[in-house]
Every structure is written in structure tokens, then in C-alpha cells.
């Protein structure tokens, strides 16, 4: 009998699509957030939770160069939640929907026996520039990320440490204040609402893109799968929040590992044509170039400051992928 451990998540999805008559990768983004799996209501502000759910699906649209249009939300509400709490979640949803420019938003409520469940779907309009001339990817095209990586995972670690202290009656909240930028990256990730429009205005069209949801390693593997090329990521070019290494030493955790395999950064990863490098650097200074496409036989690797190439490993992928 085949197990998920044998084939990995990506191969499982590929096999399920085979013979179904449908293709993967439709321009509809979907996300399900489950209490106890994706969030802890003990410390997660409900308004931030609603906002984060919308950011998760909006980022998928941005990665495909779509302008957001329609948002659909279904809340599975458990008995422990009252109307004011549901209203807080909805306020976070509508705030994010306005920020990101959605034209239509729908909401449905369903009962849940197993805690809060948030199901969000989004669709949008494709950028007109991609209809005319989406460039083909080439070796040396740039891997560009929209913000700091590993911050959300480290922020979650801070919240879990504070929860343990709170349960022991030792909470002083000093660490929350000290690492508030990391905590904020976890509780309320944000994307530039105008990123697709800015790319259109600059006439820079990425040849591929994805949203970083399960670490940079997973995202780079997805890019390699999309383009058919290998990819190199340089450890000394990964952008980090200011005190990531300070916290990493305290937790005995390598921030590079958090960036490569941590989750929920919700930053964009675009493949930008090498010929557009100077223009991209000038017009998109909040992005960092972390690597480039390579020959397919290279695979996907992390290059250390010493020049050693380490194969990327990511949850949901087989070891040889």
C-alpha cells in the first residue's frame, strides 16, 4: 500500500489529477485554516486572523499576476464562539478585502464541532500584459523575494514561549515587545496591494511566481517544477528581520533553517528576467534577489557563504525532487 510518506504531498496531488480530466493551477486561490492546526485562539487576535486568511489567498493571485476581484469566505463556527467574536473575524476579512481591492465579497456561516474553521477562496482578473507577452524563463533569471523570510516562524516561536510562561504564571510580555516585528510577521503578514499594477507600469513581467507559504525551499522547488530548470539560492542573500539571529541564538535555532523550511511568511517569489535586473533593482527596492535559475541537472540547491551547494529539502517533496 502506498503511503504519503513514500510519495510526498506533491506527487500525491499529481497522481490525483491524472485521469481526472482536469488540470491543476486554475486561477482560483483557496485556503482552509483550522483551529489547533493553523492557529491558536488563546493568543491569536481574531481580527488579525481574518486579515491573514485573506492575505493567504490574495498572495496566490499576486504570484500569478492577477488583480483580485471576488472573495468568498465560509466560517465553520464552534459553540464556544459568540457573535461578537465572529464579527471581529469578519472585520479583519473586510479590512483586508478593501486593502487588496476586492470588488465582491461573500460570507457564509456553518456550524463546526471541532473548533473554528476558516475557508477562503479568491479569484481575479489576469494582468493584460501577461496575455500579450509572458516571457519564457531562462538560465540566470533572478529569484526575487518581496520581504523578510523566517520571521513568521520565529514570531510563532515567541508566541508559543509566551503561552508556556503564561500557563506557568511567569508572563511579563517583555519578549513580545522585544520581538514585536517577528510576532507581527506571524500574526498579520501583509503584501503590497499594488504590486501587480506596479509591475505592469514598469513593464516587468516575471516569467514565473509563487507565494512562500511553507518556506523558501518549498517555493523554489515549485518554481523549478514550473520552469523546468534548476535553481540556486544563496544563503548570504536571504533577507532577515533585524533581530532574527539574536532570537535564533536564544532558541538554539538557525534563522536560515527558519527561512528555508519555516512557514507562513506569505512573501512573493518572482522569477525576473536577467535583462531586467537593473530596472527591477531601481523600481522594486523592497525586493531582494536571493538566487537564480540554473541548469536542470543542478537541481535545487542552497549555496553556503563558503560555496558549498546543499540540496534543498522541503516537507511534502520526495528526497530526490
Question: What spans do the regions from the language model cover?
Answer:
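Short, surface-exposed beta-edge/turn micro-motifs
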Residues: 25, 141, 265-268
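Glycine/charged-rich beta-loop-alpha catalytic/anionic-binding loops adjacent to active sites
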Residues: 35-43, 126, 177-182, 252
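Extreme N-terminal cap/leader segments of soluble proteins
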Residues: 1-45, 73, 92-95, 321
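Glycine-/charge-enriched secondary-structure boundary and capping motifs
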Residues: 1-11, 77-103, 110-118, 123, ...
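Phosphate/diphosphate-binding glycine-rich loops and adjacent basic-rich segments that engage nucleotide
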Residues: 128-188
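Small-aliphatic-rich amphipathic alpha-helix that forms the alpha element of a beta-alpha
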Residues: 46-70, 91-99, 198, 210, ...
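Short beta-strand-loop/turn "lid" adjacent to the catalytic site in phosphate-handling enzymes
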Residues: 66-82
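Polyanion-binding loop/helix "lid" in catalytic or ligand-binding cores
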Residues: 173-222
Amino acid at each position: 500500500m502506498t503511503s504519503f510518506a513514500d510519495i510526498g504531498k506533491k506527487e500525491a496531488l499529481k497522481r490525483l489529477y491524472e485521469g481526472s480530466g482536469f488540470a491543476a493551477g486554475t486561477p482560483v486561490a483557496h485556503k482552509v485554516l483550522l483551529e489547533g492546526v493553523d492557529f491558536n485562539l488563546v493568543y491569536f487576535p481574531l481580527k488579525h486572523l481574518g486579515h491573514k486568511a485573506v492575505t493567504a489567498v490574495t498572495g496566490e493571485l499576486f504570484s500569478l499576476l492577477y488583480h483580485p476581484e471576488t472573495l468568498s469566505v465560509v466560517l465553520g463556527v464552534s459553540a464556544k464562539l459568540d457573535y461578537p467574536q465572529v464579527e471581529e473575524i469578519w472585520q479583519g476579512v473586510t479590512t483586508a478585502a478593501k486593502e487588496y481591492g476586492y470588488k465582491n465579497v461573500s460570507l457564509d456561516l456553518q456550524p463546526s464541532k471541532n473548533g473554528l474553521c476558516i475557508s477562503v477562496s479568491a479569484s481575479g482578473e489576469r494582468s493584460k500584459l501577461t496575455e500579450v507577452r509572458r516571457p519564457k524563463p531562462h538560465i540566470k533569471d533572478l529569484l526575487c523575494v518581496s520581504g523578510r523570510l523566517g520571521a513568521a516562524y520565529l514570531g510563532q516561536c515567541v508566541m508559543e514561549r509566551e503561552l508556556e510562561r503564561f500557563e506557568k504564571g511567569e508572563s511579563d510580555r517583555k519578549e513580545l515587545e522585544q520581538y514585536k516585528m517577528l510576532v507581527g510577521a506571524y500574526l498579520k503578514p501583509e503584501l503590497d496591494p499594488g504590486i501587480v499594477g506596479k509591475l505592469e507600469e514598469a513593464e516587468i513581467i516575471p516569467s514565473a511566481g509563487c507565494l512562500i507559504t511553507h518556506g523558501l525551499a518549498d517555493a523554489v522547488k515549485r518554481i523549478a517544477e514550473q520552469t523546468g530548470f534548476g535553481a540556486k539560492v544563496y544563503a548570504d542573500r536571504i533577507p532577515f528581520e533585524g533581530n532574527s539571529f539574536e532570537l535564533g541564538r536564544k532558541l538554539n535555532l538557525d534563522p536560515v533553517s527558519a527561512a528555508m523550511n519555516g512557514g507562513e511568511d506569505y512573501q512573493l517569489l518572482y522569477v525576473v528576467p536577467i535583462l531586467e535586473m537593473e530596472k527591477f533593482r531601481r523600481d522594486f527596492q523592497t525586493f531582494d534577489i536571493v538566487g537564480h535559475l540554473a541548469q536542470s541537472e543542478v537541481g535545487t540547491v542552497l549555496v553556503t557563504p563558503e560555496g558549498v551547494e546543499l540540496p534543498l529539502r522541503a516537507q511534502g517533496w520526495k528526497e530526490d525532487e
